Amino acid sequence: MTFASRPIRGKIQCFFGMKKISVLLIAFIAVLFSCENNMQTTATPQKLSPERPAYALAIHGGAGTILREEMTPEKEKAYNIALDSALTIGETILKNGGTALDAVEQTVTWLENCPLFNAGRGAVFTHEGKNELDASIMDGATQKAGAVGSVMNVKNPIRLARAVMDKSPHVFLTGRGAEQFAAENGIEQIDPKWFFTRERWDVLQQMLQEEKEKYGKQGWLNKPAGKNPDGKFGTVGCVALDKNGNLAAGTSTGGMTNKRWNRLGDSPVIGAGTYASNDACAVSCTGHGEFFIRYAVAHDVWALMAYKGLSLEAASDWVVNKKLVEKGGEGGLIAVDKDGNIALPFNSAGMYRGYARPGERKVMIYK
């Protein structure tokens, strides 16, 4: 099933204050009701004809325990509108002849600024009550890449990752060094208080209290290793194909709630959370990062296509629903191939996601 979405009028802007999340979501939706949209929440992309489309775009806002019965109508509406708005950012760039890289960077930037998602403004808190942000971006035409990890005062980590790719001889910068590079290259830096959201803070406090009660004073250290305790793998990502046949991918995250020791997941790791090459596909992942790193998930999809000749659908499905499941990994990915085919597989209860091609546009949450 396909449909052409009508253009969204007005500038949509996420905001967050100190009130309860239910009140915020109602206010958030009130601002957005003036925007026309035409969205559906169930569908899978249709395989394209051999003719490559003018563009293709896919996004995600994280995967995990996302259940319809736990989602209020207001909250679901807010997520759907946010996803559709993000699609509009990237699709507008691609429709006007822009590059896949620019579409990816700008789309992820918008998602970073929306507090509904665990990236940028909506980032979760570390064990110490800080926000540590990670991001990566990759150009399928040149296979150049840029990544940053554990930055705390950079408003949009994806823009810093792009600068690392374009303005340095390196691929991966972290911590204070990455922040210094941001300052030297005009990347916007901001008071870390800007990242504070009451909902994320309350989740951390609840988690700390539960660990203390269950595992003692050093609860975090005594807790057995396992899956993300809140059941969600918050990440945002975008993959794109432009009119010139170039691919790009980008991913950004606040990481895992209650993380310690500058823990990094797959999002900033090229080949694990992000990968792009014009000869096959562009991939952005979301899930239990340790598993995605161990099994080089994003690169694995590309390798199955490049070396074994699998289709995008077959390669991504095998990695997510067979290999990861067998290894105990949970999550999903978005991917687009050189012909404009799109795949959005996940093995969790839900994944915030959407995609757009000429005459076709959808956003989805549940299975």
Feature locations, PLM:
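Bacterial Sec-dependent N-terminal signal peptides
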Residues: 1-50
